[in-house]
């Protein structure tokens, strides 16, 4: 079967830049779906997306749909005809369903069968519907109409190219009649561009100053920006999302270096970077020490004969933005940061839990409680907690919400607060996402933990638990943040005490009974997914969870020890033994004695196991005290041989009650040694 390249390009007014790549990918996916449904084969595919066009190239597409045969079985012959040989309703209904007379139905087999040969259609007849369906299915939240047309699309359409080989696919879609004429760059080549063949699409447009390939434009911008930054003895800040957005804004990218007055560098650089990136789509430059340079890179959509005009225009546009940031910074510094707390008395945190001012006071007290437990300073943590929300009421954060925490840091330093107190105002929000930076100071860690625990306890306390995908207060992220800080910073905090302290602070605002346990369970449940992501089996997590450690660091140390233990040759057998022992002990009548009485031993293997347990107990006690859990389990692995010998030679449920009870006590001692680390009976 012969095959040819197929190209479809829909020209539009400027498409939403943040949605450009997703629209292109969805367009391709829709066309592929239609081709597959039609049984049309092809060898390759490519999507192109630029500000004024979406295009798909399908390589070596079948020009003819293959013929198809369909066979539909109906009712059995016995049910299709009565004793007189007349057709029943079942037979007549089947024929009607197939759209034919009963005489056209095959009656030679055990069932009625309808067979039909369907000749394939020409691909040119199928493509218009496939393309139209794909465009209709694009993820467009809000469609628009234009002029007198009743058609709807994300932006008004301007032209349509549809070629199969060198032939135009005759159709009209979204008010545009298909042809082979595209459009070039709006200024460099406003004339139409004739697309000779689908394979020449990219090069035909390149001659018209349009780079249709999104990836090519992105790479060009990235490479040229890096080169220009190097020429300025700096490094460009190029967030992937911003690079994608800029790529979606230009058809013929030309990066240019611009500058601004050095006086603006007195403003926190985070504010300057935020406004230049978010509002102007500029790439900022940093020096070798990470300080902002008074220069930036803009990406023009034109190769100007006088690029200085473009540079001056961008410098003129950015100046008012930077002036605003400068004004807010100076205004906020006219009063101490702490005074902004008064404004927070009128800002509601949550209707049932009070104001942001109330939250800051709770965070202050909880941070002061947590700090000494992790090696920090209670007074400085309390101070940082008190100031933690002040910058939310400042002009700077009002204009640039992304500056919360960062603005507080600069204002605290301006007021002469200690460095760690100032840093904590920003570190309280860490980690800001999965894998993001953690607090570097103990004061910051204490405030971050306190802030997150306060939110968890408060929201749980009024019954607003996260459900499914709904988590408006980001409680899952808060819990994971607490765990990451404690585990990755190696901070040994008993969360039980901290959560109970947080509960008491809310008083009658929350339903206290069982609240602490509920919050702790939620927090430690987050570890399950964390360990699964690290490739740690869920059974390992459950073996430690059964002991309910209150410290996240201690929990993690136990998990790592169990994971190492499972690699030992003795692990599987000892896990099975622990499970057997657990089952035996659960059936014991009455309390199990704490002391083992050797006088009731009547088998040498009992003495051997008892001696091995005694020696192991003495060896692992100092290990347990030092939380050397891996070493402890490695030592306990040596119990395998005496344990195996015991169960081979000894009947635990002896007839003599005292002997039986003594054996239960011996096994309880054995199990207790392992429970010092984890319940390894759950590993089986």
From Swiss-Prot:
Tetramer of two alpha and two beta subunits. InterPro entries: DALR_anticod-bd, Gly-tRNA-synth_bsu, Gly-tRNA-synth_heterodimer. GO terms for biological process: arginyl-tRNA aminoacylation; glycyl-tRNA aminoacylation. GO terms for molecular function: arginine-tRNA ligase activity; ATP binding; glycine-tRNA ligase activity. The gene is glyS. It is found in: Cytoplasm. It is an enzyme of class 6 (ligase). Keywords: Aminoacyl-tRNA synthetase, ATP-binding, Cytoplasm, Ligase, Nucleotide-binding, Protein biosynthesis. It comes from Pseudomonas putida (strain ATCC 700007 / DSM 6899 / JCM 31910 / BCRC 17059 / LMG 24140 / F1). It comes from the Bacteria. It catalyses: tRNA(Gly) + glycine + ATP = glycyl-tRNA(Gly) + AMP + diphosphate. This is Glycine--tRNA ligase beta subunit. One of its GO terms (cellular component) is cytosol. Belongs to the class-II aminoacyl-tRNA synthetase family. Its EC number is 6.1.1.14.
């Amino acid at each position: 079967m012969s095959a040819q390249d197929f190209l479809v390009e829909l020209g539009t007014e400027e498409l939403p830049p943040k949605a450009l790549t997703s629209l292109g990918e969805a367009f391709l996916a829709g066309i592929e779906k239609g081709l597959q449904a039609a049984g049309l084969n092809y060898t390759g595919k490519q999507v192109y997306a630029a500000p004024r066009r979406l295009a798909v190239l399908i390589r070596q597409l079948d020009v003819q749909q293959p013929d198809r045969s369909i066979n539909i079985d109906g009712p059995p012959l016995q049910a299709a005809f009565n004793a007189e040989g007349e057709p029943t309703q079942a037979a007549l209904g089947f024929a009607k369903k197939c759209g034919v007379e009963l005489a056209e139905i095959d009656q030679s087999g055990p069932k009625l069968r309808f067979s039909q040969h369907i000749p394939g259609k020409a691909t040119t007849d199928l493509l218009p519907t496939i393309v139209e369906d794909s465009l209709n299915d694009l993820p467009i939240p809000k469609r628009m109409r234009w002029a007198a047309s009743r058609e709807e699309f994300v932006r008004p359409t301007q032209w349509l190219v549809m070629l199969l080989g060198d032939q135009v696919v005759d159709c009209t879609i979204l008010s545009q009649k298909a042809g082979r004429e595209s459009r070039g760059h709006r200024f460099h080549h406003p004339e139409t561009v004739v697309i000779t063949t689908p394979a020449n699409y990219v090069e035909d447009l390149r001659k018209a100053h349009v780079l249709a390939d999104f990836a090519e434009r992105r790479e060009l911008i990235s490479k040229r920006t890096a080169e220009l930054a190097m020429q300025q003895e700096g490094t460009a800040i190029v967030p992937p999302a911003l690079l994608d957005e800029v790529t979606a804004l230009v058809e013929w990218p030309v990066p240019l270096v611009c500058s601004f007055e050095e006086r603006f560098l007195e403003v926190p650089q985070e504010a300057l970077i935020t406004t230049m990136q978010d509002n102007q789509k500029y790439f900022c430059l940093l020096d070798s020490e990470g300080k902002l340079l008074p220069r930036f890179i803009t990406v023009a959509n034109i190769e100007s004969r006088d690029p200085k005009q473009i540079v001056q225009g961008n410098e003129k546009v950015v100046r008012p933005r930077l002036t605003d940031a400068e004004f807010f910074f100076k205004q906020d510094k006219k009063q101490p940061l702490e005074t902004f707390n008064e404004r927070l008395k009128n800002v509601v945190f949550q209707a049932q839990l009070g104001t942001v001012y109330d939250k800051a006071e709770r965070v202050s007290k909880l941070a002061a409680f947590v700090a000494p437990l992790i090696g920090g300073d209670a007074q400085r943590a309390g101070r940082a907690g008190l100031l933690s929300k002040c910058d939310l009421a400042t002009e700077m954060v009002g204009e640039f919400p992304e500056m919360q925490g960062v603005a507080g840091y600069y204002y605290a330093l301006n007021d002469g607060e200690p460095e760690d107190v100032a840093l904590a105002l920003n570190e309280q929000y860490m980690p800001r996402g999965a894998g993001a930076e953690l607090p570097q100071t103990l004061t910051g860690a204490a405030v971050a933990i306190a802030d997150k625990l306060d939110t968890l306890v408060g929201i749980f306390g009024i019954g607003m638990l996260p459900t499914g995908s709904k988590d408006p207060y980001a409680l899952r992220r808060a819990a994971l943040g607490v765990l990451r800080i404690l585990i990755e910073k190696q901070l040994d905090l008993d969360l039980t005490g901290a959560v109970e302290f947080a509960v008491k602070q809310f008083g009658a605002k929350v339903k206290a009974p069982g609240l602490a346990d509920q919050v702790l369970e939620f927090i430690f449940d987050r570890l399950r997914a964390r360990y699964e992501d690290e490739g740690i089996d869920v059974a390992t997590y459950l073996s430690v969870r059964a002991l309910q450690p209150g410290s996240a660091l201690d929990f993690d140390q136990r998990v790592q020890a169990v994971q190492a233990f499972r690699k030992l040759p003795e692990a599987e057998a000892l896990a099975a033994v622990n499970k057997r022992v657990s089952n035996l002990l659960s059936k014991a009548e009455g309390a199990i004695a704490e002391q083992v009485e050797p006088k009731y031993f009547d088998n040498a293997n009992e003495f051997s196991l008892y001696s091995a347990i005694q020696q192991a107990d003495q060896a692992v006690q100092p290990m347990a005290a030092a939380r050397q859990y891996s070493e402890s389990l490695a030592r306990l692995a040596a119990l395998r041989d005496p344990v195996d010998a015991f169960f081979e030679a000894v009947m635990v449920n002896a007839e003599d009650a005292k002997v039986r009870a003594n054996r239960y006590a011996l096994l309880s001692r054995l199990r207790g040694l392992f429970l010092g680390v984890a319940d390894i009976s759950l590993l089986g």
